[in-house]
C-alpha cells in the first residue's frame, strides 16, 4: 500500500475513534479492529522502528498479569474473556505510535478530536442545565446522571476522562507559548473539562 494512501487511511480511522465510541461498542470495536488489521499488514513490511518500547513492554507485562489473575480468580471464565480483549488496546497504542512515525498530519486528527470533545462537553452542559441534550436524550433512566450522546449509558464522564490528557496535553503543547489570552483560554478549557466530568455524576471519574 502506498505511503500516502496508508497515511490517509490511518488518519481517517484514528480521527473517527471518538465518534465510533459514541456510536456504540460494536462500531468502536470494528474501527479498532480495522485499524489493527491495517497496522499489522503494513508494519510487517515497514522498516520504521516503534518508539516508547518501554511502555509497550509495560503494557504487555500488565496484560500477562491480567491473564494470570483471571486463571486464579473465582469466575475465571468471565475474567479471561474480558481480559483477553485488552490486547486490542495494546495494539491500538502501537498503531497510533506507528501513525505518528509515518505521518505528517498528526495535528489534523488531534484537532478533530478536540472539536468532538468540545461538542460533547457543550452537549453535557446543555443536558445538565435543561434536562435533555441536543438530541433530546435525558434522565429518563438515570436520575442525576448525564448521558449526553450515549443515550442510555451514563459513561460520558469516563469517555471525557479517557481523552482528557491527550487533548489537554496537545492544546498546551501547541498554544501555551502563545499570548496571555490563549493561555487563559487553555486554563478555562481545562476547568470546563474537569467541571463537566464532575457534573456527570460519575463519582469515581470525578475523584480521578
Give residue ranges: language-model regions.
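Membrane-embedded alpha-helical segments of multi-pass membrane proteins
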Residues: 23-45, 83-94, 156-167, 207-208
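Membrane-interface helix caps and helix-loop-helix hairpins in membrane proteins
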Residues: 72-81, 198-203
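Alpha-helical transmembrane segments of multi-pass inner-membrane proteins
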Residues: 17, 67, 91, 107-141, ...
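Non-cytosolic membrane-interface motifs at loop->transmembrane helix junctions
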Residues: 78-85, 140-147
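Transmembrane signal-anchor hairpin modules in multi-pass inner-membrane enzymes, especially those
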Residues: 1-78, 98-114, 170-184
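Short, flexible active-site loop motifs that bind/organize anionic cofactors or intermediates
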Residues: 82, 96-99, 146, 196, ...
Amino acid at each position: 500500500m502506498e505511503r500516502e494512501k496508508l497515511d490517509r487511511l490511518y488518519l481517517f480511522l484514528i480521527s473517527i475513534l471518538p465518534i465510533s465510541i459514541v456510536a456504540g461498542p460494536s462500531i468502536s470495536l470494528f474501527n479498532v479492529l480495522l485499524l489493527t488489521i491495517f497496522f499489522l499488514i503494513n508494519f510487517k513490511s515497514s522498516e520504521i522502528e516503534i518508539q516508547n518500547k518501554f511502555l509497550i513492554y509495560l503494557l504487555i507485562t500488565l496484560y500477562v498479569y491480567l491473564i494470570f489473575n483471571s486463571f486464579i480468580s473465582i469466575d475465571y471464565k468471565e475474567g479471561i474473556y474480558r481480559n483477553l480483549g485488552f490486547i486490542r488496546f495494546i495494539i491500538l497504542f502501537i498503531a497510533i505510535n506507528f501513525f505518528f512515525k509515518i505521518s505528517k498530519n498528526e495535528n489534523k486528527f488531534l484537532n478533530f478530536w478536540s472539536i468532538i470533545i468540545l461538542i460533547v462537553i457543550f452537549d453535557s452542559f446543555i443536558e445538565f442545565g435543561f434536562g435533555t441534550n441536543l438530541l433530546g436524550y435525558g434522565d429518563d433512566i438515570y436520575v442525576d446522571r448525564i448521558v449526553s450522546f450515549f443515550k442510555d449509558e451514563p459513561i460520558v464522564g469516563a469517555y471525557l476522562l479517557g481523552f482528557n490528557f491527550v487533548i489537554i496535553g496537545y492544546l498546551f503543547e501547541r498554544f501555551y507559548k502563545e499570548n496571555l489570552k490563549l493561555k487563559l483560554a487553555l486554563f478555562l478549557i481545562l476547568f470546563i473539562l474537569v467541571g463537566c466530568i464532575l457534573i456527570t455524576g460519575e463519582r469515581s471519574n470525578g475523584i480521578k
